[in-house]
From Swiss-Prot:
It is found in: Cytoplasm; Nucleus. A motif (DEAD box) lies at residues 472-475. Transmembrane segments: none annotated. It comes from the Eukaryota. The lineage of its organism: Eukaryota, Viridiplantae, Streptophyta, Embryophyta, Tracheophyta. The keyword RNA-binding applies. Residues 46-58 have a biased composition (Pro residues). This is DEAD-box ATP-dependent RNA helicase 21. A motif (Q motif) lies at residues 315-343. Belongs to the DEAD box helicase family. DDX23/PRP28 subfamily.
Length: 736
């Protein structure tokens, strides 16, 4: 049983070190046994006899003893040799054992070192093979990716080419408009988002928030302009893509250029339609002004244009691009800020555009045409003996001598630092003396039409090099019967320097073309005839005050109740037909509700307010401009800075709290000289605007509702204390 139990014991596995140790022990035991057996063998051999005693001196010599002595000597020598050989063999055997043991130890150490070295070499070889394998895999993956990229690029190029061919021969498919389900369209939203907060429009604190006054850096804030950074990053990414395409050998196709141009136009349109109201235009630099800021600027100064390729107006004298001498003269004359007509006309005159200015007397129009005229003359050679016989460089005509002399004084004042000679030719003075002044040479002639024509007919003056003409108060000159004289003077000028009638035609850089300024308070038919004959692609600049800007707008004010507003609104829109109309509300919630009601009533309506995204605003405005929608329900976001042409009717569904907001709202109609209609629903809750509204209606000769005229709030300005009636009107009651 014990042996069976021993046989069932589990085998014991030895490590490499244990096996080496066990082998060494076994070898040591074998060597020890071998030595022990050799020693036993030596001990078993017979010992040699002890050496004989030394011989005595002079021993007896006989033959037998010498023979015995010789044999014993031989035996002794033999034994000695045998012992010596045995010791030598034993030492040799011992050395051999030591050498074999040393060799075994050395071989064992060598084997151990070789095995570890082989292990290290094997591991290093494995690592090298793995590294080479990974490098090869990466190269293959990179090659596969590059191949896939090139295949995809080639596939895209083929698809673009096929699309271009299909579009050329089959025509492009018109994108289908996504139909919105009524359940999604009229889904009620229970919460208002933070972006729909209208407190910015109502609270002045939100309109001018406090900003950090940092003393370093430039840009939006301390040199960090997020919008500018996005533009720079987009431009850098575009350049990187173009460089990659050039390295890959891919040429830009016209289709790609068209796509890039379309994207650039879209980006420019987005920047121009910037609806973010962060600062007023007075707090922005010239580069930061957006299209909306320029529209608000023009509305603030009641500047309107009619024409093509109109430059931006100037906001201050430092932005006028006038010469240093002229700016010094302007500063010396005490002109701190330019007037609206100067803001609009001077940039046009510096571009030598023909201008028709409609402005009242005293609006500063003299400087509006004198400064560009002097800037033009400074670019010409000075008048000398060689060219003084050819006449002046510029002519200004005025209807009366008083006005001509006034213009002369202003011109001399502005030409102080230029050395330009100015001569006036008016009636009541000697014509010979005036002709003598002209023959002496002058750059500018200021005259009345009749006297100037007399000088031309008598050969006192010529206009061979006159290329700058100003007609001040042209309508008044026509009314006074000076039309033939004006035509005669204009015909006396060389006609070869007239600009081509087609404004797209390229102008000759070496030719000096005529520039004509015409200022008039009105545009009668005779003035229009002059403009059509002598002006080339003129820009009409209209300047007027807020009250006069509303003369073209018929204002209707209806006193009503809140419950009657919607029915009245639907009746007005029904009578209007397909003509565009804008309905103004005070809040975004009210605008959405009114739009929903009008949509249910069958009107094509869209909304515009601060709660909409940039894309939604553009879509709404484009749809309204393109007549896909006939009604635009908006808040005061559309009241300023947004130009919507041909608006036939403006309806104030909810009256604003200030008269300025009311003025800007109704200013959406009656634009560009066209007549417009404005209707306002007034309730007894709008008492804050009663007084100012009544005054505006009276000034514009519009009907005032009896309820508004009799109301107590319309008799006194809000916040003022009414005067006490005279004491004589008091009734005194006697007491008994």
């Amino acid at each position: 049983m014990k042996r069976a139990a021993d046989g069932m014991e589990k085998p014991k596995f030895l490590t490499r070190e244990e096996r080496e140790k066990l082998a060494l022990e076994r070898r040591q035991a074998a060597v020890t046994d071998q030595r022990r057996s050799a020693l036993d063998l030596l001990q078993s051999l017979p010992r040699p006899p002890p050496p004989p005693p030394p011989p005595l001196s002079n021993p007896p010599r006989d033959s037998s003893s010498s023979h015995h002595r010789d044999s014993s000597d031989r035996d002794r020598d033999r034994d000695r040799d045998r012992d010596r050989d045995r010791d030598r063999d034993r030492d040799r055997e011992r050395r051999r054992d030591d050498d074999s043991r040393r060799d075994r130890d050395r071989d064992r150490d060598r084997d151990r070192g070789d095995s570890s070295r082989r292990d290290r070499d094997r591991e290093r070889g494995d690592r090298d093979r793995d590294r080479d394998r990974e490098r090869g895999d990466r190269d293959r993956e990179r090659g596969d990716r590059e191949k896939d990229r090139l295949e995809k690029m080639a596939e895209r190029e083929r698809e673009k080419e096929l699309d271009a061919i299909k579009e050329q021969y089959l025509g492009s498919k018109k994108p289908k408009k996504r139909v919105i389900k009524p359940s999604e369209k009229f889904r009620f939203s229970f919460d208002w988002e933070n972006t729909e907060d209208t407190s910015r429009d109502m609270n002045s604190l939100y309109q001018s928030p406090h900003e950090a006054r940092l003393l370093y850096g430039r840009g939006f804030l301390a040199g960090i302009d997020r919008r500018e950074q996005k533009k720079v990053a987009a431009a850098h990414e575009k350049e990187t893509r173009a460089e990659q395409r050039r390295k890959a050998g891919l040429d830009d196709r016209p289709e790609d250029d068209a796509v890039d141009k379309k994207e650039a136009d879209a980006a420019a349109k987005y920047d121009a339609f910037d609806m973010r109201v962060d600062r007023h235009w007075t707090q922005k630099s010239l580069d930061e002004m957006t299209e909306r800021d320029w529209r608000i600027f023009r509305e603030d100064f009641n500047i309107s244009y009619k024409g093509s390729k109109v430059p931006r107006p100037m906001r201050k004298w430092s932005e006028s691009k006038l010469g240093t001498e002229l700016l010094r003269a302007v500063e010396k004359a005490g002109y701190k800020e330019p007037s609206p007509i100067q803001m609009a006309s001077i940039p046009l005159g510096l571009q030598q555009r023909d201008v028709i200015g409609i402005a009242e007397t005293g609006s500063g129009k003299t400087a509006a045409f004198v400064l560009p005229m002097l800037s033009y003359i400074t670019r010409l050679p000075p008048i000398s003996e060689e060219n003084e016989a050819e006449g002046p460089y510029a002519v200004v005509m005025a209807p009366t001598r008083e006005l001509a002399q006034q213009i002369e004084e202003e011109t001399v004042k502005f030409a102080t630092y230029l050395g330009i000679k100015v001569v006036s030719i008016v009636g009541g003075q000697s014509i010979e003396e005036q002709g003598f002044k002209i023959r002496q040479g002058c750059e500018v002639v200021i005259a009345t039409p009749g006297r100037l024509l007399d000088c031309l007919e008598r050969r006192y003056a010529v206009l061979n090099q006159c290329n700058y003409v100003v007609l001040d108060e042209a309508d008044r000159m026509i009314d006074m019967g000076f039309e033939p004289q004006v035509v005669g003077v204009l015909d006396a000028m060389p006609s070869s320097n007239l600009k081509p009638e087609n404004e797209d035609e390229e102008l000759d850089a070496k030719t000096i073309y005529r520039t004509t300024y015409m200022f008039s308070a009105t545009m009668p038919p005779a003035v229009e005839r002059l403009a059509r004959k002598y002006l080339r692609n003129p820009v009409v600049v209209t300047i007027g005050t807020a009250g006069k800007a509303t003369d073209l707008i018929t204002q209707n004010v209806i006193m009503t109740k809140e419950s009657e507003k919607m029915s009245r609104l639907q009746k007005i829109l029904t009578d209007l037909g397909d003509k565009p109309a804008i309905v103004f509300c005070n809040t975004k919630k009210s605008a959405d509700a009114r739009a929903k009601d009008l949509d249910k009533a069958g009107f094509r309506v869209t909304t515009l307010h601060g709660g909409k995204s940039q894309e939604q605003r553009e879509t709404s405005l484009d749809g309204f401009r393109n007549r896909r929608f006939t009604v635009l329900v908006a808040t005061d976001v559309a009241g300023r800075g947004i130009d919507i042409p041909d608006v036939a009717h403006v309806i104030n569904y909810e009256m604003p709290s200030s008269i300025d907001t009311y003025t800007h709202r109704i200013g959406r109609t009656g634009r560009a000289g066209k007549k417009g209609l404005a209707t306002s629903f007034l309730t007894l809750e709008n008492t804050d605007i009663f007084f100012d509204l009544k005054q505006m209606l009276i000034q514009s000769n519009s009907p005032v509702p009896p309820e508004l005229a009799r109301h107590e709030a319309s008799k006194f300005k809000p916040g003022s204390v009414p005067d006490r009636p005279p004491r004589r009107n008091d009734t005194v009651y006697a007491t008994h």
